[in-house]
UniProtKB/Swiss-Prot annotation:
Keywords attached to this entry: DNA replication, DNA-binding, Nucleus
Alphabetized PANTHER family for the sequence: REPLICATION PROTEIN A-RELATED, REPLICATION PROTEIN A2
The protein's role, per its UniProt record: As part of the heterotrimeric replication protein A complex (RPA/RP-A), binds and stabilizes single-stranded DNA intermediates, that form during DNA replication or upon DNA stress. It prevents their reannealing and in parallel, recruits and activates different proteins and complexes involved in DNA metabolism. Thereby, it plays an essential role both in DNA replication and the cellular response to DNA damage.
Protein name: Replication protein A 28 kDa subunit
Compartments, record wording: Nucleus; Nucleus, PML body
UniProt biased composition (Low complexity): 1-24
Provenance organism: Crithidia fasciculata
Gene giving rise to this polypeptide: RPA2
Presence of keyword DNA-binding: yes
DNA-binding region: 60-138
CDD domains reported for this sequence: RPA2_DBD_D
Length: 258
């Protein structure tokens, strides 16, 4: 009887904890950020960081490994006792330290210098500098850096402008360019050409919302792009460019996929 009741209580507690964790994830989702955004984040005490008026407790950043937090880490000395690898990474908007938890009982080599990585985890402030602690993985596709920067731009736009389209910016992509400057990637946009930027945006939309083989329709792509001040004509032109370059294909039911 007691065992049954204890099991019931344990299940209820586990269910409650799981619900609380899911609620916390909804309230504080993992935010794609540039390093510039992290370095310029507002500190409100207790190690809490605020970006675009929202508290950030979990984040994803990308960058190239340019050094190690521990000078002996490259040879393995000191990393095991600390139970983490610390990497200094840059995305050309700034530089921070990201940490990867490791199993002290397993032999593990640090990621080599000059490798492009994606770091995701908890955001903390250490010695007055932001750090991300969690997982650090190598990026196989160099385009992931561009897609991450676009994610950071779009997230900044959603949080600062919502779905409103600034008057006078319709079709110009100016709101996207302004947001690119805000997150520090304005010089990374190919030639500053909005049409080139739109092709990257459309590929990003399909990657995130295409649902496997389903892809996205022209109407869905147009609606997504219009939220960021691009016109239907802009979308059609960009999709023709992507099709000509072999970056997207049209399915039998007139949808687009990559």
């Amino acid at each position: 009887m007691l065992a049954s009741q204890a099991g019931s209580n344990f299940s209820a507690a586990a269910s409650s904890n799981g619900g609380q964790q899911q609620q916390q994830r909804r309230q504080h989702p993992i935010r794609p950020l540039t390093i510039k955004q992290m370095l310029e984040a507002q500190s409100v005490g207790g190690g809490v960081m605020v970006v675009d008026g929202r508290e950030v407790t979990q984040a994803t950043v990308v960058g190239r490994v340019v050094g190690y937090e521990n000078a002996n880490m490259a040879s393995g000395g000191g990393a095991i006792t600390a139970k983490h690898f610390g990497y200094r990474i840059t995305d050309n908007t700034g530089m921070i330290v990201v940490r990867q938890w490791i199993d002290a009982d397993r032999a593990q080599e640090p990621i080599p210098l000059n490798t492009h990585v994606r770091a995701s985890g908890t955001v903390n402030v250490w010695q007055q500098s932001p750090i991300v602690t969690g997982t650090v993985v190598s990026m196989a596709d160099s385009n992931e850096m561009n897609y991450h920067m676009l994610d950071a731009i779009l997230t900044h736009l959603r949080l600062t402008q919502g779905n409103k389209r600034a008057a006078g910016n319709i079709g110009s992509g100016a709101s996207v360019q302004n947001s690119a400057a805000a997150v520090g990637v304005q010089n990374m946009l190919p030639g500053g050409d909005n049409k080139v930027l739109l092709t990257d945006l459309l590929v990003s939309f399909i990657k995130q919302n295409g649902h496997g083989d389903a892809g996205m329709s022209m109407d869905e792509l147009t609606m997504a792009a219009q939220r960021y001040s691009f016109t239907p004509g802009d979308v059609r032109t960009a999709m023709r460019t992507l099709a000509a370059e072999g970056k997207v294909y049209q399915t039998h039911d007139n949808r687009f996929n990559i």
